[in-house]
Amino acid sequence: MCDAIQIRLASPERIRSWAERVLPNGQVVGEVTKPETINYRTLKPEMDGLFCERIFGPVKDWECHCGKYKKVRYKGIVCERCGVEVTESKVRRHRMGYIDLAAVVSHVWYLKGPPSYLALFLNMSSSEVEQVIYFHSYVVLQSTTELVQPKQLLSEDELIILEERLANQPFQVGIGAQAIQYLLQQLDLDMEIRVLRNQLFHAKSSKREKLMKRLRILDNFASTGADPSWMILSVLPVIPPDLRPMVQLDGGRFATSDLNDLYRRVINRNNRLKRLQEILAPEIIIRNEKRMLQEAVDALMDNGRRGRSVVGANNRALKSLSHILEGKQGRFRQNLLGKRVDYSGRSVIVVGPELKLYQCGLPKEMALELFQPFVIQRLMAQGLANNMKAAKKIIQRKEAIVDQILHQVVKAHPVLLNRAPTLHRLGIQAFDPILVDGRAIQLHPLVCAAFNADFDGDQMAVHVPLSVEAQAEARLLMLSVNNFLSPATGDAIIMPSQDMVIGCYYLTANNPASQAKQSHYFADFEHVLMAFEQKQINLHTWVWVHVNNNLNIILERSALQEDWIQTRGESLFLKTTPGRIIFYQQAAYHVGFYNLTINKSHLKELVKTVYNLKGMACATQLADDLKQLGFHYATTCGLSLGIEDLRVAPSKQKIFQWAQQAIEKTEQLWQRAQITHVEKFHKVVDTWSEASETLKQEVVRYYEHTDPLNPVYMMAFSGARGNLSQVRQLVGMRGLMADPHGQLIDLPILSNFREGLTVTEYLISSYGARKGLVDTSLRTADSGYLTRRLVDVAQDVIIRQADCGTLRGIAVPVSKALIGRVLAQDVNEECKRNQLITADMLVALRDTKQVIVRSPLTCEALRCICQLCYGGNLAYGHMVDLAEAVGIIAAQSIGEPGTQLTMRTFHTGGVFTSAQTASVRATLDGVVTYEGRCKSTRTRYGQEAWLLETSTPLFLQNDGQQHRYDFQAGTVLLVKSGQRVKFNTLLAYLPTSTRFEKATKSVDAHNAGEVVFDQLKLEQNLVKKEGILWILSGQMLHLPAGSELLVSNEQQIKPAQVLAQSYLRSRAKGIVQIHTNQVELILDRLSFEVKEPFHFHSGDGQIIAEKFEHQTPTGGQVFHRNGQIWLVPAAIYEVSSQKDLVDIKHGQFILANQRSICGVKNELSGWVQLVKQNEVIKEIRIRPGIYLPKVKTNQLGFVQSHLLLSSYGINAYTRRFCYVENYEQGILISPVYVFAGVSPPKIVAKSRWLSLVMYQTCMFQHQQWVKSYKKVYLMRCQLQLKVAPQAPLNQVTVHKEKNRREWRLSYFSNIKLQAFQTIKWLVKNHQRVEADVPLALIQLVSAFNGIVRYHPMLNRLLVVSDQDVITYSIGKPHHFQIGDVIRIGDQISHGLVAKTSGFVIARDANQIQVRIAQGYFLSRETICYVKDGDLVNEGDHLASLVFEQVKTGDIIQGLPRIEEILEARKPKNSCELAQFDGVIQEQSLVSDDGRVQAIKGTLIVCEGTRVQAGEPLTDGAVNAHEWLQIHFNNAVPYRGMVEAARESFAKLQAKLLHQVQQVYKSQGVDIADKHIEVILRQMTSKVILDDPGDSDFLPGQLVYLNEIASYKHVIFHPVLLGITKAALNTESFISAASFQETTRILAQAAMEGQIDQLRGLKENVIMGRLIPAGTGAKYL
């Protein structure tokens, strides 16, 4: 086997050598010269064709083409008759051919990039090279004059002019691929590289990028030793015929690979070009043929890369060589990375509760088929069959012996079970098969979690490992009992669930209903169980039992020991139940006595403890015991769910009343304009969230005390199925729901599913439910794609060495997450460097806050990770083995939960759970003091608060007691310094790490009125000082446009008083027509009486009517002669199938109505004429007329009938003219119909501006055949309405009467009367008026008493009526002044409370008048759209409140977020980062050394704050690329290049690790840090060289940091690669090509002569080798 693979450009000679073979007679074969494939009669390949046996080898094993040699004994002989070598037919899979091209062509991969290699080599643009190759432009090859430069492009015209001008100064031009080949041959690569290096030294940054790219490609290419001109092909290889097969289908037709069609096109065009060159055809024809050949080769190489795709018979683009390689169905992914597996089967799975953990049930029928070869071998070995055929017959007869042998064969032979999708390695596990009846595979219930299987119709595949090695691997590594822990987290994945959990829960439950009146005491556990079996006590009866003093008793955390354990003398008594004793004896005896109700988490803890203490064998046995125990008692408890079990807590209504009252208070605060609309919304939402949470706790308490064995309660609280949220929805309330955009609907669903939802509630809840289902289907695909990218980026990360020797590490806080890590530094005597941290070691580290551990991120091993830096293997709990493929495990660990999360979206059905902000409360009564700088703000509920701008301690003091709270900047304080507070008072909200986004909420006017600002200050529409926007109510009246106001501002008005009036005037001279809601002014009208059968169109387009004339008796041929239309008749029938031609012959005479033609009865007598098209009969024409056989005449065409016919002795002929034509062996004289010709356009009616014009057109052209056997109209007459260009408008309406049509040119004025408007007509209907005459008077009339307010800019009138004023009789002197604000709920006097808010507008001694007002509180940064004093209408947009809201953390945001982080995408609206350490001063950052960075956006840090480099200064997401560069730039002066890169990478890695974990943790998913670290290592291990210094690398090259670290004078910068980019930039071109962009990767690899060292897994799988990991590693 090879150790490495190189890919390079092939020379023409090399291509020929692949195919050429010399026959014994000296003939050289290999060139394919014919486009034929197989002979259609013999079905054998054509010689020298695309399937030629002489070139590619015989079609049948050991048989030549002509059949002279048949049998293996002639092996190696070449037939002297047909030239075919007698050999195996499989040589047709690897023998190649070639096509010698008549003209060179370019390879499309190197022409059409990106990048275009031909353009880069020649230093031309890709479009210029394309123009030359496709014969659009000439290129100058050599020149002796300065007027034309080499490589200059010339058009045909330019070339002719230059040739004339420079006749004495010769220059050479070329065109096509030949010209490009010449230029490439002239290229001196070494010289070009030297020039480029020199240019690069002096180049500016703008040019450097292109120069570096060109230098990199030329330098790499030069090292391959290839010739650039080989990119132009003169010989085209033909791939072996078995890779482009042709197969015969059932119906005798053939199906062939698209490649054969593409090769055929190339060969046809090549042969045609050769012929044209031989006959010296004109240059233009040859050029065209060369271009077509170039296009044919392009299509073969990569169809559709340039121009339109070549399509096959069914209009489908043909699959070219490139398409065969790339994509999911391509060669790499379909056939090399994934193959169909022999010895496999699949079937539905069912549960096998009786199975052991390492067993599976295999259907006998399937086992017999899978293990048939083994059974046959045993039958033959035992002498029961002499050969395979006999053995197979025994099996088919199903003899008893077969069953026995099958049991023997299967007994010690493990099988692999796989469930798709295989998201992690636990998706394939090995089991010992147990033969079962039926056709379903039986699966152990405990392995379902690993397979993510359930029994609702899932299917699984079975694979049989054949070799001894494969069986050993299956048994030792893949057996289900060996996969006890999850590789992603290290937790047990074999876990009792569902029924098993319910059984254990029921067994150990506390049931008050089954308690005895007096206490029972027992001597030991056996006596208790004896009493239980004798039914003296039941499963849940409390008993006191004597126990050993050294028994480990595990109680509930909240339990008091004296309630459960009594000491009497030296004896110890335990209060427990028979159920808990059974659980101890059968399951928990390894750990201790669990004297509590067992739920899922207890079982998980028990299994993990046993695994850690006793090892895998014990844990496996325990798992099986728990399964048996759980299933038994799940059956015993007979759990069933009835509607009566869904009991609603009686306290529900009280909770709702409390919530309703709280919301009413909030509503009143809003109406009093003390909080904004958004603050009200937040308060309402949080009130309902709190109510929902309280109700949930009440439900729990209710079930716990009244019915602990309730099925719903048991399921949710044991962890068997469902959760508290679902129980709350069933028996509490559904709560708040989200709309399709993820925004909350503040109308909660108060009902639960037990009570049933109202229609409104059902509609609200349908949003979330649907969103969940849609999201699931959309995101599952995304998650699979993420896993694929992760696998590709990390597939070559393998543990290849024991220790890299690094001294670096990462700081990790002491927690359970440390288990499996290796210490990087000594901590104490027990914990030394390079020691693996175990659970026991954590105890020794408990006094340490954090430790430095080794990590994949800091490993200095090149192209791998060392054992110590990786640490423990989470799946086995010991140090990771050498050759472990940790990259794949990491990718699966991150990808698999992504899929799980997407699939789990819909289970809560869009129910909203509020994200509570962390808060701090007072721990004692006392006085608050603090000194930090803070600014005033408001909480999300509108409470007054203070935002800390600096980190500050807060002290709470009382009688010598003092508590200190350390608050960081961003904390919101709810108390002032010096304020006295009570115990448990809310002091502060802590800043959260939650991601916020800006949002707006519009404020609309609830009533019409006048705007008044109260303490509100604006700057350019932005609220700078918060305050209240009041709308003083009134009736809004809209003034008609152009109206005259009849009242003055502040005037008192009465009912029926006219306030304003306006006139409706005529726009032009015309007749008035009054309609219900509009008035029409008719400027012009035109009438037309319908005498003829015109078909009138209903639209008022230009063509308003049409009719048809000149009906023919049948179809025929139309001629235009002498201004007339002449028709030579013929009935024409279209032939659709061969049946139509039965009994019909050319020249036959057919009588009318005697027979049917093409399924239609023939109505015309005449002679049959059959019309062919492409040798196929398409039409039958019946030609009436006189046929004169054996007659010849010169008078063909149109002839006067009597002149012609009289000469042949025919007297009677009805038509004046006839048409003569040759027919069969004589002439046919056809009659001619003559019709009047087309008349010029004629005006049929006219008025001042309108006219009706008649147009005639013939529908058939001269000599056109009218294909019909029925009557046809020849002439179309159209009436067109024309409006004169000088008319004032062109809006025409049509009016119908019985026989008349009238068209009117009219103006329409809509009359839409608003409220309080009246209209008086000043003209009569149908009256003629002049221009600008008043037609009507529109008046605005008052309906009530009041005062007028007028706003001239808005054309609005406000009437403050009695309805807008409330009078309060106080009955005694008062303190109210005019202008005072009274708010709703204010006490005006004893027993008198304000019903609405308003302003005092009048007062006297005993009463006040208040004008009703609605207030809106506007916070800072609100955008206000109205000004003080404006008049607004109900529904007008007043302002937009700007606020921050939490981004919802559903995985629908989560998965794209993970993708965003791992793909290292640059955010759209990124924030501005501090480029260096410094202080904020006046919208800029100033460093200590005087550097200044101007800041463009809105600052999110306060003036005078000190910030570190890389900190965000403005709003937006952080751009990780920029962040990395800033940290690198700041570290370089102090740390040097390599250390600065490592340091900046380390900071970025920590940041990205935290971000990824944050997304997964928010969904409750655990992933070990080290898996994410492995992926991040791949993303942050490379740098881009700016100056290669003394290294052999090139500028702009991507290099491993660890590889470049040893060189001096190297200048580089670190780069963060997204996972896709990192996967494509791997060192293995085979791996990269099988991932994405196959053709680009292969083209680049060939240009650079890349060598694949076959280090990773993918490239070895593709090459068919053992993978260099696990048991396939070289050292094993």
Swiss-Prot record:
DNA-directed RNA polymerase subunit beta': region residues: 1-582
Compartments (UniProt record): Plastid, Chloroplast
Lineage top rank: taxon: Eukaryota
GO cellular component: chloroplast; DNA-directed RNA polymerase complex; mitochondrion
Other facts noted in the record for this chain: In this algae the rpoC1 (beta') and rpoC2 (beta'') genes are fused into one ORF. This seems to be the result of evolution acting to reduce protein size rather than horizontal transfer from a bacteria. Thus this is considered an atypical member of the bacterial RpoC family.
Similarity comment: family membership: In the N-terminal section; belongs to the RNA polymerase beta' chain family. RpoC1 subfamily.
Protein's recorded name: DNA-directed RNA polymerase subunit beta'-beta''
The species this protein was found in: Cyanidioschyzon merolae (strain NIES-3377 / 10D) (Unicellular red alga)
